[in-house]
Amino acid sequence: MIYKVFFQASTTEVPVREHTDSLYVEAVSERDVRDKLKKHSYNIEFIQPVDGAFLDYERESENFKVLEL
């Protein structure tokens, strides 16, 4: 399954909504996503499963790229 991860790039700064970025990760569970991103210094805000019509919509975006971790 593909998950959309909303995160802040720095764990040392206070999270600000306007600075939230997102990325896509293929994993078997939310815990697997967190394990795969553990080595990165992301402040993870939310992990959302993406499937069905939502996945089709996200694929149309020019920013859609699933990370190979």
Swiss-Prot record:
GO cellular component: DNA-directed RNA polymerase complex
A single MF term (Gene Ontology): DNA-directed RNA polymerase activity
Keywords from the UniProt entry: DNA-directed RNA polymerase, Nucleotidyltransferase, Transcription, Transferase
Record-level GO BP terms: DNA-templated transcription
Classification via InterPro entries: RpoY
EC number: 2.7.7.6
Catalytic function, reaction form: RNA(n) + a ribonucleoside 5'-triphosphate = RNA(n+1) + diphosphate
Superkingdom, natural source: Bacteria
Top-level EC class as recorded in UniProt: transferase
Cross-referenced Gene3D superfamilies: RNAP, epsilon subunit-like
Assembly mode: RNAP is composed of a core of 2 alpha, a beta and a beta' subunit. The core is associated with a delta subunit, and at least one of epsilon or omega. When a sigma factor is associated with the core the holoenzyme is formed, which can initiate transcription.
Function: A non-essential component of RNA polymerase (RNAP).
UniProt record similarity statement: Belongs to the RNA polymerase subunit epsilon family.
Protein's name according to its UniProt entry: DNA-directed RNA polymerase subunit epsilon
Protein species of origin: Bacillus pumilus (strain SAFR-032)
Gene, per the UniProt record: rpoY
